[in-house]
Amino acid sequence: MGLEPYEGRYTLQLQDWTERAYKKRGIEYKVVPGTTIDDTKAISVGQVLDAHGRSYFGMSQMMNLVQMMRNGEVTKDDVVFFEDMFQPGMESLPYILHQVEEKHRPTIYLRCLAQAIDPDDFVHVWGMSKWMSMYEQMCNEIPNVKILATNEEMVAHMRIANWSAPIYNISGLSFGKEEVQGRVPDRKPFIERKQRVIFGARWDQEKQPNFFMALALKYKEKHPDVEFAICQGGPLRSNNQFYVDEAKYLAKQGTLTIHENLKKNEYYELLADSRVMFNCALQDWVSNTVSEADAMGCNTLFPAYRSFPETFANDHTRMYVPWSMEDAMDKLEVLLSKPSPSIGKISDWTDGTIDRMIDIMTGKGEQWRRDGQHYRNTVSESKY
């Protein structure tokens, strides 16, 4: 049960990455189709996914899954994997599964990407947190359901919310390193790259764009030749218009460069000619931007916050104290001057995320289970 593709999001490649891993492992699978609301592959309403498009695609997909279940094509020996826990029409699953014989009840795996358990998620910004938390509780009541969390810290949020279903940490987001690198085979050596710092997250308040703008202003006082670039897959927009107005003002002043409406390959080409990907998000779980930048040979500088110590395997040289401008600037100066000896390791690890999910779904990943008494014992351990 995949996600609809968006040009400005990693969902554009998600199904391809997943199918490559399934084929490599010899997994018998079927992609349940959905119908897109239009052919734009654009987010018109909302932030993370298009509000109408996600609903339309998800419900059409659920209709097809229900048809397969009614036809007897889905049994207790099967797994139904949802790329995203939020799936319009999901309530039909517990409604059906509570009424059919056990032989017609597959195991359900839901991958959670954020939602109401994250206090900085967009559902809180838009006042949707109450009904979303109730939706999450419903998902926990689906027969034979299991939850896939993207990292240890997200597991903690699920436990705080008293989720009752079995929880597994997949320690990463889905990623296909070979496919991504294949889009830009000729990547410049680090020393030949532009002195450019990229902000690749959404320009929304939970990503703290004000911190990035303040960093650019302060850093350029001593290093005026360094470029600070905002890269967006669509037009520059935000859930707080102030950030858009301020970014455009700073662009006119020469402090920022704004790259809008980028196609994937255009974005990757910019990464392959840049030195640092910078992140200052309050709300980010692993982040696809770190995998993409790392795969393109770009240094990554992220806050030592929430999931990032796990993602970076506790690498103190590429994480700064949140929210210390001084520490961020000191580490940025180093990472602009030379490549980290650990470039490539993050994307190698996240390249295995789909395999970890396959292991869990085929009964070979119990070491990743996190709903027991000692689920916090593994938090400080480097995963690679």
Describe the predicted segments one by one.
Residues 1-93:
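N-terminal pre-catalytic "stem/leader" segment of glycosyltransferase-like enzymes
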Residues 60, 323-326, 334-384:
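A charged, aromatic-enriched C-terminal amphipathic alpha-helix characteristic of glycosyltransferases
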Residues 125-147:
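Membrane-proximal helix-turn-helix segments that form the acceptor-binding/catalytic region
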Residues 186-220, 229:
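Conserved donor-binding/catalytic core segment of Leloir-type glycosyltransferases
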Residues 227-244, 260:
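Glycosyltransferase donor-sugar binding loop
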Residues 241-265:
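Nucleotide-activated donor-binding/catalytic signature segment of Leloir-type glycosyltransferases, i.e.
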Residues 281-283:
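Aromatic "clamp/platform" in nucleotide-sugar-dependent glycosyltransferases that forms part
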